[in-house]
């Protein structure tokens, strides 16, 4: 996988404390970055797919139906890194940085997370943390309304996410579709092993990896039409559960989208 830092697309990075050599960084802290990746898949059917499409899409085929995902984006809020002896309160802060509950907040949100469908590992957020042990990332999958100024500003920039927490665009058997999910849900992802941040240590990176290959898939491996998973449709709960189970978090200091511990690097 390649590494990419989409600063222009992910404006939240610019609102944080800065890069690791920023002289304004709080003394005695260490930068921890949050990156995002999509689990790599090997499409079953490639012969009718052009190379430019492959560069920006995920393609799935069950032998009967073909699903092409051109865009997958989620809205997150209250993104916090929790210490091993802390208990994050997702509603406890509206500002990035350290919280009184011993947690470090990447972003209060709402934050638009565009999933990289081209094999890249995208750096999306950064926070400066105190030395210690960190065991969990917490965040909300956030259905946005305009209850406060931050949400109103988000919707002005992203009007297609009004009342939406997940948006997927692509084709189903060659026909364009737009899938949306209207779910508010809290997520807790544990680090195994926990992240050890040493005093004066180098920048660390955590990668949030999503496996989207099963988002629109039944237990028997057959794909489902995204139109049947829209709010109120018969496959709504199936796809909602698949998305909820697709998150994985791990230490990835070499930014290759793979678990450092399993590679023998951690």
Predicted features along the sequence, with ranges:
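C-terminal motif of bacterial Sec signal peptides marking the signal peptidase cleavage site
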Residues: 15-18
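Residue-level signal for mature regions of secreted extracellular proteins and peptides
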Residues: 12-13, 96
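Bacterial N-terminal signal peptides that target proteins for export
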Residues: 1-9
């Amino acid at each position: 996988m390649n590494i990419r830092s989409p600063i222009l697309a992910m404006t939240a990075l610019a609102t944080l404390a800065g890069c690791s050599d920023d002289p304004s960084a709080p003394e005695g802290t260490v930068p921890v970055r949050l990156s995002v990746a999509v689990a790599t898949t090997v499409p079953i059917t490639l012969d009718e797919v052009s190379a430019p499409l492959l560069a920006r899409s995920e393609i799935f085929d069950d032998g009967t139906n073909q699903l092409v995902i051109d865009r997958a984006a989620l809205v997150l809020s209250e993104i916090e890194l929790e210490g091993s002896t802390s208990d994050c309160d997702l509603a406890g802060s509206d500002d990035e940085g350290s919280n009184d509950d011993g947690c470090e907040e990447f972003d209060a949100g709402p934050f638009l997370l565009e999933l990289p469908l081209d094999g890249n590992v995208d750096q999306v957020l950064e926070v400066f943390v105190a030395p210690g042990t960190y065991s969990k990332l917490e965040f909300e999958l956030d259905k946005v309304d305009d209850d406060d100024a931050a949400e109103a500003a988000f919707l002005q920039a992203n009007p297609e996410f009004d009342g939406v927490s997940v948006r997927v665009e692509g084709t189903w058997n060659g026909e364009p579709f737009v899938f949306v999910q209207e779910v508010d849900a809290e997520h807790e992802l544990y680090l195994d092993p926990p992240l050890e941040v040493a005093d004066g240590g180098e920048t660390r990176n955590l990668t949030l990896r999503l496996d989207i290959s099963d988002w629109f898939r039944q237990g028997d491996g057959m794909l489902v039409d995204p139109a049947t998973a829209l709010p109120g449709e018969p496959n709504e709960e199936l796809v909602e559960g698949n998305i909820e189970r697709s998150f994985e978090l791990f230490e990835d200091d070499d930014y290759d989208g793979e678990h450092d511990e399993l590679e023998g690097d951690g």
